[in-house]
Amino acid sequence: MSFLYVCNTSSDNISKINLASFKEEIKIPLGMDKINKIGPHDLCVYNDMLLSANIYSSSLSFISLNEDKETENYFIGMHCNGVKVWQDNAYVICGETNSLFLFSLTKKKIIEEIPCGIFPHCISICEKNNLAVVANMHSESITLIDLSSKECIKNIKVQSYPTKAIFSEDGRYILVCESKMGLNKRGTLNIIDLKTLESLKRIEAGSCPVDIFLDGKYCFVSNFADGTLSIIDVNNRKEEKRIKIGGMPRGIVKSGKYIYAGDNYNNVLVQVDLIKESKKVITIGGEPTGMTLC
């Protein structure tokens, strides 16, 4: 059975969605003291645990996938935006410290800090090349990091307000979501060659693209400001289709013939059937943001 877990940032919980029935099974509450705001923002899976990077409590939560409850929580650094796991370490980016923190999942402590650009917003890892890439919103750059040496390889200048950067499945390219937030321009997907670190092509998406999900040759983009989803053919380097779903789509994933997008404005999860081009909607928590399949 497949599940989708969604961060509900303003309601301090995580929705567990049964994809077969497209129903919310449970909201998993975060905040072990039940007093302070948590703000879950990004998720990743580690063994039988779900890790949540929390922007308000500046912490990393451990959620048991078997028990559907938070079991541990550790302070990391101010404004934890994103988290990924590589070799028993959690790589957590903190927007207000402009840093990437390595948190040992065996020792349960921070073991290293790597500087990034200004206000890092997301992190992605390429296991094929032992690399990580961080999108820095306010310095309009991405930081490429060697995971083996734990050193910055290069800060690469990109266009305005990059919200996400990921690696292509073959490890040859970096795909950067350049949102151009607040500039009254359409955002772009920037394809960067990993060998030369030069831009090969910028493909226009919708207004203020904020998240991307890669499946084969297709990149699915959530356009926050115009309520649309872009489907981009990475190989042919063009936008093939744009689907109107309304609201303010934030996090996006694809499973089978469906795209799932969290509507940050209406507090709903939208399921789009790519074949029928129809949609279904269910209510979840407040301000859905990061999501992951499991």
Predicted regions, residues:
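Predominantly soluble domains enriched in secretory-pathway, periplasmic, or organellar proteins
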Residues: 1-294
